[in-house]
Amino acid sequence: EALRYNLGINYSREPGVMKESGRNSMGLNLSLQYRRKKWNIQNQLSLTNVRGDNSPYGSFSQYTKLNPYYRKTDENGRYTSLLDQKKLPGEGGGTVNIVNPLYNLYQKYKDFTENFSVVDNFNIECAILENLRVSAGASITKGTSRMEVFKSMNHTDFLPETDLTRKGSYSKSTGDNVSWSVNASVSYNYTKDKHLLSLFGRWNVDENKNNSVDLSAMGFPNDNMDD
């Protein structure tokens, strides 16, 4: 007869390539086991949360395309939104804006994903006879996910846009899933002399449900509309 348990907590941070980007992971694991004569009972519980943040500094590739001699600040030391304008070849070719990704540090910004999950597994086994065992188990998993991206109307992505109703963007995705399963089994083994008889039966039922919602909108004249 014995009761055993094991508790584990973990945390990790993986910095991204760009400043203020990265992924944080947190987890908790609890394992219980109880044995008494013919009985063996086990339960395992796991909780996990993972969050990833993208950098307000933009992507690394944006900086590799910039001329290192561009002046990135004005006379007051503040980052400018526009670094340069280049004319396209040909008649009526127009111009291309060379934007400053550092300018977006002044703007309201949000870009992250977050996932949370709970997993619980339960199992019970009984040795009714020396050669006859019966077991049953159940498991349930529940998870949620969320993604949000908000860019201010002053973000450099909207620099060439003149229509105020198309300046600023917000997108959000949420999802949840629940799955469960229940099983039962019986096994019988009989040995006599050189002969062996084995019988095994198993019954299982499971279900999985998923739901998701995706939203996106453009036109945010107020930076506080992402709250």
Tell what function each PLM region has:
Residues 125-130:
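Long hydrophobic segments that form regular secondary structure
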Residues 1, 16-18, 27-119, 135-227:
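Surface-exposed loop/interface segments of Gram-negative outer-membrane beta-barrel transport/assembly proteins
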Residues 8-13:
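Transmembrane beta-strand segments that form the barrel wall of outer-membrane beta-barrel proteins
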